[in-house]
Amino acid sequence: HENKKPFDIVEMSYGEQVLWPNHCIQGSMGARFHPDLNHTRADVIIRKGSNPAVDSYSAFYENDKVTPTGLHGYLKNREVTKLTLVGLATDYCVAFSALDAEKLGYAVTVRLDMARGIDSDGSLNAALDKMSKAGVNLVNG
């Protein structure tokens, strides 16, 4: 985005989009799993954010709100009904995932002690309020 800097907001075909500093770039160290995470037992790894034209906060949908990641179908096929979410960032990826999961009918808990927010201009409290009002269970420990 020419003449733009990180945290500027631009209008995309799907709505407003925050321009984030480069992070989790495919093939980079920042996109790798932590070395202490044993992902060899994982049945599936859902990748998101790989379309350069559409950002992806939620684990369930791209930011266009129509392109699924495949996670809902995967969980539905396994009759999963309850989810506990952790990670980064509480006020963006975790919140968008929690809200989408709630809309899709899951019982959702967010472990706040295992998540960290960006908290740009009150975004963390706004996200916590939105999740709470949507029925997401917010817990510490």
Feature roles, as predicted:
Residues 84-87, 107-119:
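A short glycine-rich beta-strand->turn/loop micro-motif centered on a GG-aromatic cluster
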Residues 92-105:
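Histidine-anchored nucleotide/phosphate-binding helix
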Residues 48-49, 87-89:
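Short, well-ordered beta-to-alpha junction loops that form the rim of enzyme active sites
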Residues 1-82:
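Active-site alpha/beta core segments
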Residues 32-44, 119-141:
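Structural recognition of alpha->loop->beta junctions
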